[in-house]
Amino acid sequence: MFDVNLFDELRIGLATAEDIRRWSKGEVKKPETINYRTLKPEKDGLFCERIFGPTRDWECACGKYKRVRYKGIICERCGVEVTKSKVRRERMGHIELAAPVTHIWYFKGVPSRLGYLLDLAPKDLERIIYFAANIITSVDEEARHNDQSTLEAEMLLEKKDVEDDVEAEIAERAAKLEQDLAELEAAGAKADARRKVQNAADKEMQHIRERGEREVARLDEIWNTFIKLAPKQMIIDETIYEELVDRYEDYFTGGMGAEAIQTLIRNFDLEAEAEELKEIINNGKGQKKMRALKRLKVVAAFLRSGNDPAGMVLDAIPVIPPELRPMVQLDGGRFATSDLNDLYRRVINRNNRLKRMIDLGAPEIIVNNEKRMLQESVDALFDNGRRGRPVTGPGNRPLKSLSDLLKGKQGRFRQNLLGKRVDYSGRSVIIVGPQLKLHECGLPKLMALELFKPFVMKRLVENDYAQNIKSAKRMVERQRPEVWDVLEEAISEHPVMLNRAPTLHRLGIQAFEPKLVEGKAIQLHPLACEAFNADFDGDQMAVHLPLSAEAQAEARVLMLASNNILSPASGKPLAMPRLDMVTGLYYLTMDKGEDEIGGEGRYQPATEDRPEQGVYSSYAEAIMARDRGVLGLQAPIKVRISHLRPPSDIEAEQFPDGWQKGQAWLAETTLGRIMFNDLLPWNYPYLEGVMVRKGGAGNKMLLGDVINDLAAKYPMITVAQVLDKMKDAGFYWATRSGVTITMHDVLVLPNKTEVLESYEKEAERIERKYWEQGALTERERYDRLVELWKDATDTVGNAVEEMYPDDNPIPMIVKSGAAGNMRQIWTLAGMKGMVVNSKGDYITRPIKTSFREGLSVLEYFNNSHGSRKGLADTALRTADSGYLTRRLVDVAQDVIVREEDCGTRQGVRVPLGIEVAPGSYDLHELWETSASGRVVANDVKDENGEVIAEAGTDLTEELSRTIVNAGVLEIKVRSVLTCQTPAGVCAKCYGKSMASGQLVDIGEAVGIVAAQSIGEPGTQLTMRTFHQGGVGGDITGGLPRVQELFEARNPKNRAPIASVDGTVSLSDEGNFWTLTITPDDGSDNVVYEKLSKRQGLAQVRRPMESNPDAMIERSLRDGDHVSTGDRLMRGAPDPHDVLEVLGRRGVEKHLIDEVQAVYRAQGVAIHDKHIEIIIRQMLRRGTVIDAGTTDLLPGNLIDLSEAKQVNAAQVAEGGQPAQLRSEIMGITKASLATESWLSAASFQETTRVLTDAAINKRSDQLIGLKENVIIGKLIPAGTGISRYRNISVKPTEAARNAAYSIPTYGDSIYGDDGFGEFTGASVPLEEDYTF
């Protein structure tokens, strides 16, 4: 086998018959496969050993030569080469066709390449190929011109002969008539009889005359056709063509079928045709010019690539190796065979029959019919079903052709090349492993033994437990006791990778240190669940084993769970306490103000009678008080603390030089909060507040913010240790808090019936107005009832909320953010409220009961509509979201960080801060998703002109606050949208990696990270289109809206946008508006006609007439002023319009804002840079308007960076540069237009992409990831980029000793908190290790 690393590009082209014969090891002449008795391949058949190689290693077919010593010998008896049977996967054969056939891809594909080349309509081409019409292939015009007068004279003579014959025949008939009449008269016949004879004779003479005229007309037609005969002329009438051949075969050639096409192609002058087409393009217009452009594309492709167009017509077809179309014996003695064998057999059968008929000299009509059948059988082999009805096998199933083997999810590309099943893997159900550290997982003993079998066997032999590998294998299979000890050794410090399907983002596969566990289930760390989106209700996970030292090192350094705490999409922590852990930490840090034990130990200020109570000299004393039973966790106390850093305000006040460990300070806190702070690093400022997961206000603190802050200030290993401590503490205190839910914890509102009475009356009033008085429309009734019952639900819900005491477990679970929300408590204890039907509209009767009371039958029925719709929606959404992710990955897969800095000074402006009060500033609400993690593009100066931030500085939160406090609210930052790196992006334009908080590494596959970050939350987005109540129809939202934006589609309710600044005037045209903008600059008015009133005019913010300081939202009116790019109607603008009016930057901003609006509505945080990467790919190409003196074709799409280089070269040579128009392409179109044909073919429309690539002889430079995965090369990302290849690292002795000296944390009340012998820290190397 050849080495994939030996080449840097892959080219595809058209194979000629010579190429096919050169690849082939022999001709397949018989349709036989294998002998049913001997089960040996038939000679010259589809499995022939002489052609394809031996079926058994080192053995010829007849058995004369056996064993490897005869390697390379060709047996003189059977003709089989003695070699490995593996060659049957590589060796090809061929079938010599008795008549040429066209390749169906090139004639039937859209557009028809053969049709464009020969300037024939596909319909005509089909007639010729399938023997329904003749075509003239060449005309000897000179000979025809020279002999024309002679031939004409001959034709006139022939016509005269015909006329003379007719006259003679008529005269003869007239004479016979005379004779007949005379005889009748002599016999005394009546006048009637004479008239009959006369009429019959007249009729007959008329027929003779007409026949003569027809014959003359036919001769005229033949002559006129011959005189005008030109190449590529089609003659459908078979008789005329035969006459032409009989009379004038020396002056022209013609024919039907692929032979005629082949002759035309061989006579075709590509260069002359190209010149002619260029002439038409330069001077022509309209349809003619468009067709010439399309034809020139095909002609130029053949000229440029050097492909021989004759390759589109085949004289021989290849037969793929037999191992790729196997035939296997089933249990019952029958055979299962690949469909290809059936298709090949049809071809061979028809080909052999055609040969026989030609040899026998069969009539032409029979031969042509056989040729047509041969053409059809080759079509079926190449692409079954492309033309006409597909060839079917048993059970009416269409047979899978060569094209079908490549296409679709089950095709070669997606099934076997982009995703393979691998060895050293297993899968099992997952269960929770609360005792594990973050970097560990529990691996069942049996599974581990099977996975690590080779390693265990090797060690058994090394440690002298077994003599050889065979006995070691037996020991492992019998599970001897010593095997387990050796297994422990084998798995130590050998990470495994866990994966849960669907792998929606890169954290769906992470590395863990295995720990052996009993049972058969994999144990997963509770904090890793969020990233995997795993729960323990029967989920399964797959285990993979990294084998090589490099793979293990990467798994450990890059993929270990404790190194992947932050989300690559937003930079927020994913490994965060949740559910029970949150409840535990909430319980631990609550401040009851009252002591749950008895009150003696809590803090009480001094009174006249007694001194201060509840003041402790140390944390230890407070714990002792708790052990004695006088102090509760949540009681307020005062305590002297010296082992934890004070909060920043106390530190600033009491320790102006900075606090040192051991210095004491007095804290007013609770014992639980000290315990919580004990979990954090000792030098982290003391946190005084209740820990919650969401809804942090007042003295509540968000756990996420704490972990975010830790991740920013401490190394990952410290954060991982803290998270593990939090997990242990969370579970420990959740257990001890006794928080559970029982039915009795659900308190029912006692006065609900009275509360609902008034609403019932109001509902009756609305119904009466509609039914009896007719005072309301159907829509008004619906809106009022919905509003009324929503208000009722809120009233009941709020009453329920107030009724619950703080220590009730249900509000505790909700308020801590562990699970659920208040709305769910309302449905449990208040009322369910309004529910939707299957269309998504509200049912106007609410569900008045709660789940605690139970629903009535009707209520249950009403409720089931919405529930079912929810389930159906989720299923559809999952599929749609997966497809969106796939398209995003495909469009961005080749965006990799290629260099440190592209050197551009360009950037985009982002909002940094807002003025909250005069002179007081704060960070902008969108700072986290737009400005954070960027690099400053230009020097930022304050109002005095002093530089606050230099260009190239990382924009941290601290620096952002400094800039904002200086009054600078918007700055220019580097962005991938303005990056000048040709293929990929540079690190400075990308900024920080959200997952690490550091500047992104060179080689990072940021395109795929972006696609996953956008696609992964896709399932959370809704499928609903939002109703606008009356006007304007529906607004598309959720997932459909995101798809609409990324596909750059014309939106459903398209809103026109103002193309100039100016004043609006409206004129009413019945159902439509006509809107005119009078531009401010005095240019011509811009008129927008037929604007639907149903859609409604755009909403604008304008000052109130009564109070100009206040702003209101109202519809656009006569006399309003609009700016360029403003919407004129409700709905969404078309991205193509935005690009035209506002330019490239305008459409970039529009798309980012619109996509973010959808995700923010669902509470999903995604950084703008991910969306920017996709948009950059959508805007990468432009259309050539004027080619100048370049070789580009007008109307062609071309990469803008490539066009830049071409233009620069032209200008340097003194030529005219090409002019381009920016284009916005949807992600599907952009994926298919990629430079890499391998990537495009594996995405969609495989046959079309391959057809196009072959004609253009496209070379794949193997720049992206997909193309390298397909051919099995190391991907050019991460550690696979060229700069990291062939590195050898040898650690020094000191480095070896220091390899795992790692900080561990001391014991605490939660048991051993040491991180185990391995924690995931990377090996420190000496300074001189430069890569």
UniProtKB/Swiss-Prot annotation:
GO biological process, one term: DNA-templated transcription
GO MF annotations in UniProt: DNA binding; DNA-directed RNA polymerase activity; magnesium ion binding; zinc ion binding
The protein's name: DNA-directed RNA polymerase subunit beta'
Organism this protein belongs to: Corynebacterium aurimucosum (strain ATCC 700975 / DSM 44827 / CIP 107346 / CN-1) (Corynebacterium nigricans)
Gene from which this protein is expressed: rpoC
Amino acids binding Mg(2+): 535, 537, 539
Entry-linked Pfam families: RNA_pol_Rpb1_1, RNA_pol_Rpb1_2, RNA_pol_Rpb1_3, RNA_pol_Rpb1_4, RNA_pol_Rpb1_5
Complexes and interactors: The RNAP catalytic core consists of 2 alpha, 1 beta, 1 beta' and 1 omega subunit. When a sigma factor is associated with the core the holoenzyme is formed, which can initiate transcription.
Cofactors demanded by this protein: Mg(2+); Zn(2+)
Binding site for Zn(2+) 1: 60, 62, 75, 78
Enzyme class: transferase
Note describing how the cofactor binds: Binds 1 Mg(2+) ion per subunit. Binds 2 Zn(2+) ions per subunit.
NCBIfam families, per database record: PRK14906.1 (NF011498), rpoC_TIGR (TIGR02386)
Function: DNA-dependent RNA polymerase catalyzes the transcription of DNA into RNA using the four ribonucleoside triphosphates as substrates.
Cross-referenced CDD domains: RNAP_beta'_C (cd02655), RNAP_beta'_N (cd01609)
